[in-house]
């Protein structure tokens, strides 16, 4: 299992580094080039070619540092992909995305665009404690204590395991 850290900070800010400023990226982890865990940092760290390879996005919760670049991903992928990207999350997160982000006011509804037969995103409802097979990995959401409905993830691939708390 190959995990690439795209960002792991609560905000996008510059911090001093030994060789100059470092741009912190919000939460995003790319697993095996195809599965993204949280969507805080995508386009600011991945070339379009890399974004096209993403098949599944797992979301832990709705806080902005975990979904910030999801609309940008959708915009970048319109007309660029043959299959929609699966947005996998617990029901509260999927409902919140539709109500507050992809509502036609803040951002277009990429669950229906560019057309309902070929949307950029398709929702996939995760259930706490149930393992699903996504991108060849076992994915189990585990409820964690946070101020909004939130899950962490247990990812299993062969003999490899990653646990991600979300916050």
Label every model-predicted segment.
Residues 1-163:
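Binuclear metal-dependent hydrolase catalytic cores
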Residues 165-167:
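DG-centered beta-turn motif at the end of beta-strands
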């Amino acid at each position: 299992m190959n995990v690439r850290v795209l960002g792991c900070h609560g905000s996008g800010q510059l911090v001093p580094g030994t060789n100059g400023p470092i741009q912190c990226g919000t939460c995003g982890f790319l697993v095996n080039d195809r599965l993204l865990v949280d969507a805080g940092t995508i386009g600011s760290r991945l070339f379009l070619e890399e974004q096209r390879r993403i098949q599944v996005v797992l979301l832990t919760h709705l806080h902005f540092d975990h979904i910030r670049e999801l609309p940008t991903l959708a915009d970048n992928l319109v007309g660029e992909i043959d299959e929609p990207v699966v947005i996998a999350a617990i029901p509260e997160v999927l409902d919140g995305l539709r109500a507050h982000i992809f509502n036609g006011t803040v951002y277009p509804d990429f669950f229906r665009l560019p057309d309902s037969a070929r949307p950029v995103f398709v929702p996939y409802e995760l259930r706490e404690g149930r393992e699903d097979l996504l991108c060849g990995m076992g994915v189990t959401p585990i409820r964690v204590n946070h101020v909004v409905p939130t899950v962490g993830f247990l990812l299993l691939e062969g003999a490899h395991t990653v646990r991600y708390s979300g916050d």
